[in-house]
Amino acid sequence: MAQTAMIIGASRGIGLGLVRELAARGWRVIASERSHSAGLHDVARERPGQVEIVTADVTDRVQIDALRAAGTPKSLDVLLVNAGIWDAQPVDEASDADLLRIMRVNAAGPIGTARILLPLVRDGGILAFTTSRMGSIADSSGGSELYRMSKAAQNMLARGVFVQTAKPRGIPVLSLHPGWVRTEMGGDNAPVGVAESAHGLADVLSKAHPLDHHFLDYTGAELPW
């Protein structure tokens, strides 16, 4: 039987690349978009019956609740929450609105979404988040403070989801650094292509992992918290 993954945030970039990669490996993929994504709909047309498109925004509780209500409990092998925005401002130069926005999109939104949708993941499945090694406290070179802060917060909150909810059901939690990828957010100078990152992430998601909260990059290497 084909494995099933739900990818929240699949309109473009890494999320879209992962939809393509998993579908090519025979997975069934439920992929979310906030607004119409031509690229995602192209993949769905190429993979009829294999790629299903849903609407979801991690900052919209009504949409996420509706997605859970429409889903089948314990039907997913993998739930990956892929959401993020970039803001390199120092914290002392950011407005209150900037602070709230990046924390909502990069930390609170993905974690809240995961908590709502976790009942759709089978016992022993995988819950994953796209994070960044820039959220590492042990390996920080400084700068880009808003972004680093938000990803460190996401990592901490993901630990709470693991301890409180996922661990009792045998679900490991993966906080995944996809690499510095050539996307709209990563820019043209990034050294890693979308296909390379997606291939590595798919390998990581396809493997069994010890029951813990893991901080890994797209090659499967452990990263320091």
Briefly describe each language-model feature range.
Residues R25-L40:
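Conserved glycine-rich Rossmann-like NAD(P)H-binding loop of the short-chain dehydrogenase/reductase
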Residues I7-I8, V81-N82, I126-S132, P172-H177:
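Structural signature of the Rossmann-like NAD(P)-dependent dehydrogenase/reductase core
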Residues I171, S175-P178, T183, G187-W225:
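C-terminal helical subdomain
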Residues I85, P90-L100, I111, D123-K167:
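Catalytic loop of short-chain dehydrogenase/reductase
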Residues T59-K74:
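Conserved Rossmann-fold cofactor-binding substructure of NAD(P)-dependent oxidoreductases
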Residues E46-V62:
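Rossmann-fold cofactor-recognition segment
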Residues S11, G15-R20:
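N-terminal Rossmann NAD(P)H-binding glycine-rich loop of SDR-like oxidoreductase domains
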